[in-house]
C-alpha cells in the first residue's frame, strides 16, 4: 500500500498531509538492528527505496543476509552513527527510528539530527521507552545493583531466578526476559533514557511538528479507539494520552510508538 493509505488505516481520525507518492519513496531506517523494520518498510510501502543504517557492523551483516530476495535490491545497508549524520546530503520522505534514540545520552539531540534529514512534509515513525511503562525495569536495575549481579550468562540466569521470587516477577510480561541476550539488553543496558509524554509533547511543539498518533497492535488499537470515542477525546490529544497513561501505566510497556509529520 502507499504510505498515505497505511496511515489512513492506522489513524482514521488522524490529521496528516498525504505525500501522494507511490514510487521513489525514500525511506531511512535509523538503527536497523536485525533488519526487520527495513524489510517491513520495503515490503509494506509502495515504491519504497530503503537506506538501513546501524552502528553495529555485525547487525548490518545479519540484516543483509536475512533480506528476502523480493526486496533485497531495494534495501541499501550502511554503517553509521546517528549523531554524525548531520552532514549527510540525502533527504528522506519517511524516517523510522524505533528503539534507538533512548539509548543516547540525549535522545532529543539524535531526534533533531534525524529531523534535519526529513524532507518538508515528510513523515517520521519514532519508538521511545516510557518511564511509566518500564517502572519495574528501573526497579529491577536497582535490585541488580544492590545484589551485585553481573551480566554473564550464568549471572543473568541467577538474576532471573532471584527476580522471580520478588514482586518484580512482573517482568515476565516482557518476552525479552526469557532470552539471555535480550534479557541483558532489557535489564543491564548501560545507557537508557527515561521519557514521558509531556517531554515528547514539548519537543513536538518546539519543532512545530504535527503529532499524528500512537501506533498499537490491532486488539489494543480498537480498545483505545473505543475508549477515546466514548470519552469524546481526540486521538492525537497528548494531554489526554498522558492522563490515560498515569491511570494505566502499562499502556506503553513496550515503547511509545508514534507518527509525526514535519511542516
What are these language model-derived features?
Residues 86-95:
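A short acidic, Gly/Pro-enriched loop at the edge of an enzyme's catalytic core
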Residues 1-25, 40:
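Conserved alpha-helix/loop element of class I SAM-dependent methyltransferases that forms part
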Residues 123-167:
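Conserved class I S-adenosyl-L-methionine
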Residues 56:
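Conserved SAM/SAH-binding beta-strand->alpha-helix loop
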Residues 108-120:
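A short glycine-rich, Lys/Arg-flanked "PGG" loop and its adjoining helix->strand segment in the class I
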Amino acid at each position: 500500500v502507499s504510505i498515505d493509505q497505511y496511515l489512513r488505516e492506522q489513524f482514521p481520525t488522524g490529521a496528516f498531509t498525504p505525500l501522494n507518492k507511490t514510487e521513489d519513496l525514500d525511506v531511512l531506517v535509523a538503527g536497523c538492528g536485525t533488519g526487520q523494520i527495513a524489510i517491513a518498510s520495503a515490503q509494506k510501502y509502495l515504491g519504497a527505496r530503503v537506506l538501513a543504517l546501524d552502528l553495529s557492523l555485525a547487525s548490518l551483516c545479519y540484516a543483509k543476509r536475512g533480506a528476502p530476495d523480493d526486496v533485497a535490491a531495494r534495501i541499501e545497508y550502511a554503517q553509521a552513527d546517528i549523531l554524525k549524520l548531520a552532514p549527510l546530503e540525502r533527504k528522506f520522505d519517511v524516517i523510522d527510528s524505533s528503539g534507538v534514540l533512548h539509548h543516547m545520552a540525549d535522545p532529543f539531540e539524535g531526534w533533531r539530527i534525524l529531523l534535519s534529514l526529513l524532507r518538508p512534509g515528510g513523515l517520521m515513525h519514532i519508538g521511545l521507552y516510557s518511564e511509566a511503562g518500564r517502572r519495574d525495569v528501573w526497579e529491577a536495575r536497582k535490585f541488580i545493583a544492590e545484589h551485585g549481579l553481573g551480566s554473564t550468562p550464568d549471572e543473568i540466569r541467577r538474576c532471573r531466578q532471584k527476580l522471580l521470587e520478588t514482586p518484580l516477577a512482573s517482568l515476565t510480561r516482557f518476552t525479552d526476559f526469557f532470552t539471555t541476550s535480550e534479557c541483558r539488553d532489557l535489564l543491564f543496558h548501560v545507557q537508557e533514557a527515561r521519557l514521558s509524554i509531556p517531554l515528547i509533547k514539548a519537543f513536538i511543539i518546539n519543532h512545530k511538528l504535527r503529532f499524528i498518533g500512537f501506533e498499537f497492535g490491532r486488539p489494543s488499537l480498537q480498545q483505545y479507539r473505543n475508549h477515546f470515542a466514548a470519552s469524546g477525546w481526540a486521538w492525537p490529544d497528548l494531554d489526554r494520552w498522558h492522563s490515560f497513561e498515569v491511570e494505566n501505566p502499562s499502556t506503553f510497556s513496550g515503547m511509545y510508538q508514534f507518527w509525526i509529520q514535519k511542516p
